Amino acid sequence: MDSTQPLLGKTILNTRGKSAAAAFSKKILAAGGTPIEIPLLTFQKPKDTTIIAETIKNLHRYEWLVFTSKNGVDFFFEFYDQVLEKVTKNIPMPKIAVVGSKTEKTLLAKGYRPVLVPDEFIAEGLFESLRPYVMPGVRFLLARGNLSRSFLVDELTKHGAVATDLIVYETVGDSRDKEHLITLLKEKQIDIITFTSPSTVKQFYKIVEQTEWEEWTNHVLFACIGPETKKAADHLHIPIHICPKNYTTDHLLDEIINYLKA
């Protein structure tokens, strides 16, 4: 293996959404690999955004604003800026907590610094970090996607806090490259398939479930980010070979390289 290009000769399926795919592909190329981008998900605003605008106008009622993804930050602040243009008063920002380094980086780019970023990049880790602040009557606003897990809302509510789930974006399966994906798998042109969320796993399976995908991928390494993504794959009998302890694409790529070296 070339130490400067450890992924040389490997074709890696990048299933990230279109806006996030380029950065991951760039890292694959830098390591000598060949990325193929087939986005399995797309993200869009909810059809009815009235409740989002009203909630943002009343942001002062919340002690905490919680983001669990980069998309949550991007969509929330798009709405926030739109509301600011229409109101004369300033809208104070609550204390902010986030999950994940990418979410934190996106928030910092908007000009805001989170009070809490847990070491563990999952909802359970965030709840443990928030626990000292969770008291009866304390109000938390969670700006998230429609497919987000209910864990945080459930735990906050269970401990007496008032948790409001604000859906600022919707995750939709993307099947536009379905035939291309099936052809690549059938012709065994893919060496490694990556998943970055449970939703990407489910959409992949939805596309291939009526095919002979198991035979077509018997040589493929499946790699994913996070225990929830692995759980979704296990449920659908997709064999995960690589799942890093840190839930970022950088660590995912490092683990793929380490696996190939072994």
What are these regions (language model features)?
Residues 1-262:
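Signature of uroporphyrinogen-III synthase
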